[in-house]
Design a protein with these regions (language model features):
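Aromatic-Pro/Gly-enriched surface loop or interdomain linker
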Residues: 5-91, 240, 248-252, 304-305, ...
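Helical hinge/lid and interdomain linker segments adjacent to catalytic or ligand-binding clefts
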Residues: 53-135
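A glycine-rich, often tryptophan-bearing local segment used as a flexible ligand/cofactor-contacting loop or short
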Residues: 102-171, 190-191, 195-197
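Metal-dependent polysaccharide deacetylase catalytic core of the NodB/CE4 family, i.e.
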Residues: 131, 136, 281, 294, ...
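Catalytic grooves of carbohydrate-active enzymes
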Residues: 279, 286-288, 401, 462-533
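Surface beta-strand/loop "capping" patches
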Residues: 532-573
Length: 612
C-alpha cells in the first residue's frame, strides 16, 4: 500500500492497516526567546500606565511574569522599572515581588510615604520590612505553608467590586490533603488598617491602609502562587471542581487588580476582553474521537449556523488500529471534515491515538512523520511508538493535507492529559493555540499565554483556552443546561469567556441541548468558534497602544498598532465619550469604543473628545 505525502513523495508500506493519506509538511521551527529583560519589554510610554516597580535586585530576580499575565489579561496598561523616582511620577504603583530590609533605604521609604500622603496609590505583595510597617498598616507577619483557605471580609472596599459571588468571596489555596501548600504571609494589622481578606488561621491576607490623600493595599500572597502556579497546573490541587462549575480561584486576583486600577486611576482606560463591545463570549467546540462521531458533526454545524453561531471541531486523526479502537481517519469521514470546513466550521487537532498516557509521553525527535510514525495504544494509559511531537505534528500534517486550505493551529489533547513538553511541541510544530486544560483545574476563566515547559520563567507562543463546560460528566450535558448557563453567566459578569466541549458521538440529545443553551444566551454574549476568538485574543495580547492628551482641552489621542489582522478591539473608558474619529464606533453607554478592522502592521490614530 502507498500513501501520497506532501510534495508528491510516495511511501511504500508493509502495513496493510495504514490508509492512503495526503499530508502537508509542517516545518520544525526553532524556539524564539522573547526579550529577556522586562525593563525593555515593557517600557514607559504614556502617563496612564501603572508603574510596576520591580523590587528584586541581583542576577537572578523573581520573574514578573505572574504580574504581567494578570495585567495583560485585564487590559491594564503598565510599564516595568527599577527606578523608584520614575515609578513615583505615576499615580498608581505596584511593588513586585516583595519588599525586605534590602529593598529601600530609609530615604526611599520616606519618598513612598510622601507619595501616598499626597494622593498616590500603591498595591504591594509580601512587604516584610519594618521600615514600612506604618505605611502599610501592619505590626507583624508570620510566613507559613499550612494555610489552606482564604475568605474576604464582609467590609466593602473598591478593590472587591467584582467579587460578588460565593465562589469569589472564598477560595482555596491548596487541598486539605496536603499538609503544606503555598507560602502565605499572615499579617497582624495596625489599629487603623482594614482587613479585606483573612486566612483560615485568622491572620490578614489582604489589608488596606489610608495615609493622607492616598491609600495602600498589601497582599500576603504571591501572584506567582495564586495566578501563574494555577495556570501552569502546578498548584496543590487548589481547585474545588474539575469541570462544569464556576471556579475563579486565580481570576479573583486579576479582578482585584482591575478594580484597584478602575477605583484610583485618573481617567482610566482599559483594553476590554471581549470584541465588539460585548460582555462575554461562548466558544463552542466538538471533539471528534470515535469512528461514528463524524456524521453527527454535520447536525451540530447546522444547528449552530441556524443560531448565528459556529464551532471548532477537534479531530483525532487515527490511522492505526490498536488496543483502544480501530482506525477511522479515511473516507467517508474525510469527506465530512471537508464539508464542515467548507460550511464555515474550523478544525483543530485532537492527536492521533488519543491516549490517557499522553502526559507521560517523551517529547520525541521532531522528525516524526506519516506514515513511518506508527503509535499504538496498548491499554488504558500505555502506548508504544508514541511521542508528543508525533501526536502533535503528524496530526497537523494529515489535517492540512486532507482538508483544502486547512492550517491547523489549534490543539486539544486526548482526555485532556498534558505533558510538560506540550508547549514546546506545539510551538515548534507551528501551532498557536491549545485547549487541553479545564478552567476549573487551572482556576482560570480568561485565556492566557502558556508558559514554556509549564514553568514560571517564560511564556511560549501558545495561548491556552481552558474548557469550562463538557458533556460527559453525569447526568450528561442534556440534563445540565441550566447549570451550564449559570456558569456562563458568572463568567460573563467578569468579562471572561466560557469554552464548551461537546463530543459529536450523537446529535439527538446533545444537539437539542446545545440549541437550548444557545437560545437562552443573552444577546451580549458572543457565540463563536474557538479559532476565531483565539485569533482575536492573540492580536489583543500583542497590541501596542497608548493614550495621550492632545493640545485641546478634553481631547485625547488613542494610538493603536497591531501586527496581526483583528476585528472588534474594544476600549473601555472611565469618562463618557462625546466624539471620536478614525472610523471607531462608540457604544450606546458612551464608555466603550470599538475600533475598525486593523490590517497587519497598520497603525491608527483616533482623536477622542470626552463628554464632560
Amino acid at each position: 500500500m502507498s500513501a501520497l505525502c506532501g510534495g508528491g513523495t510516495v511511501w511504500k508500506l508493509t502495513s496493510q492497516a495504514t490508509p492512503v493519506l495526503r499530508t502537508k509538511a509542517a516545518p520544525l521551527l526553532e524556539i524564539v526567546h522573547k526579550q529577556a529583560d522586562p525593563l525593555q519589554q515593557f517600557p514607559e510610554s504614556f502617563p496612564l500606565q501603572v508603574a510596576v516597580l520591580w523590587t528584586n535586585p541581583g542576577s537572578d530576580p523573581e520573574n514578573p511574569l505572574p504580574l504581567v499575565h494578570s495585567l495583560k489579561e485585564m487590559g491594564i496598561p503598565f510599564f516595568i522599572t527599577r527606578d523608584l523616582g520614575q515609578a513615583l511620577r505615576h499615580h498608581l504603583v505596584i511593588l513586585y515581588p516583595s519588599v525586605d530590609s534590602h529593598t529601600f533605604t530609609p530615604l526611599q521609604a520616606d519618598q513612598l510615604t510622601t507619595f501616598v500622603r499626597q494622593g498616590g496609590f500603591i498595591f504591594a505583595q509580601n512587604v516584610f520590612w519594618g521600615g514600612l510597617q506604618n505605611l502599610f498598616g501592619f505590626r507583624s507577619f508570620a510566613p507559613l505553608r499550612t494555610r489552606h483557605h482564604l475568605a474576604f471580609s464582609a467590609t466593602k472596599d473598591a478593590v472587591t467590586k467584582y467579587l460578588n459571588r460565593a465562589e469569589e468571596r472564598e477560595t482555596q489555596l491548596g487541598s486539605d490533603q496536603f499538609p503544606e501548600v503555598i507560602w502565605s504571609n499572615g499579617y497582624v494589622p495596625d489599629a487603623g488598617a482594614e482587613v479585606l481578606a483573612h486566612f483560615d488561621d485568622g491572620s490578614a491576607a489582604l489589608l488596606t491602609n489610608s495615609v493622607g490623600k492616598g491609600k495602600v493595599y498589601l497582599l500576603g500572597l504571591s501572584l506567582l502562587d495564586v495566578v501563574l502556579r494555577n495556570q501552569n497546573n502546578h498548584d496543590y490541587e487548589a481547585q474545588r471542581h474539575y469541570v462544569n462549575a464556576f471556579e475563579p480561584g486565580a481570576d479573583i486576583w486579576l479582578l482585584v487588580l482591575r478594580a484597584w486600577y478602575e477605583a484610583y486611576g485618573r481617567d482610566w482606560v482599559r483594553l476590554a476582553t471581549i470584541p465588539g463591545g460585548q460582555r462575554s463570549a461562548l466558544l463552542l467546540s466538538h471533539d471528534v474521537d470515535w469512528e461514528n462521531s463524524f456524521a453527527p458533526g454535520l447536525d451540530f454545524a447546522r444547528i449552530e449556523k441556524a443560531n448565528q453561531a459556529g464551532s471548532t471541531f477537534f479531530v483525532q486523526t487515527k490511522y492505526v488500529d490498536d488496543a483502544n479502537s480501530k482506525a477511522f481517519f479515511f473516507a467517508p469521514n474525510l469527506d465530512i471534515l471537508r464539508q464542515l470546513k467548507a460550511g464555515g466550521s474550523t478544525v483543530g487537532s485532537h492527536s492521533i491515538i488519543h491516549s490517557r498516557g499522553f502526559n507521560k509521553f517523551e517529547l520525541g525527535s521532531g522528525r516524526e512523520t506519516y506514515p513511518s510514525y506508527q503509535p499504538r495504544g496498548l491499554g488504558f494509559d500505555t502506548a508504544s511508538g508514541a511521542t508528543v511531537f508525533g501526536e502533535v505534528r503528524v496530526s497537523k500534517e494529515l489535517l492540512d493535507g486532507e482538508i483544502p486550505a486547512q492550517d491547523t493551529i489549534f490543539f486539544r489533547a486526548g482526555h485532556l492529559r498534558v505533558p510538560v513538553s506540550l508547549p514546546e511541541a506545539l510551538e515548534r510544530s507551528g501551532y498557536q493555540f491549545d485547549s487541553s486544560f479545564t478552567a476549573d483545574d487551572v482556576l482560570s476563566n480568561f485565556p492566557f499565554a502558556l508558559p514554556r515547559n509549564l514553568g514560571f520563567e517564560e511564556d511560549s507562543e501558545i495561548y491556552e483556552f481552558p474548557v469550562t463546560i463538557e458533556d460527559e460528566e453525569p447526568p450528561g450535558f442534556a440534563k445540565r443546561v441550566p447549570q451550564a448557563l449559570q456558569v456562563i453567566l458568572a463568567n460573563a459578569e467578569n468579562g471572561a469567556v466560557s469554552v464548551v466541549l461537546i463530543h459529536s458521538n450523537e446529535s439527538t440529545l446533545k444537539a437539542a441541548a446545545e440549541q437550548d443553551l444557545l437560545r437562552q444566551l443573552p444577546s451580549d454574549i458572543v457565540k463563536t468558534d474557538m479559532l476565531t476568538f483565539a485569533k482575536f485574543w492573540r492580536a489583543r495580547d500583542r497590541l501596542q497602544w497608548s493614550l495621550t492628551p492632545s493640545s485641546l482641552p478634553s481631547e485625547v489621542v488613542l494610538q493603536v498598532e497591531s501586527n496581526e489582522s483583528v476585528t472588534g478591539l474594544t476600549f473601555e473608558f472611565q469618562r463618557p465619550l462625546a466624539t471620536v474619529t478614525g472610523g471607531a464606533i462608540m457604544s450606546p453607554d458612551n464608555r466603550h469604543l470599538v475600533l475598525p478592522e486593523l490590517a497587519p502592521g497598520r497603525s491608527i490614530s483616533i482623536r477622542i473628545n470626552y463628554l464632560d
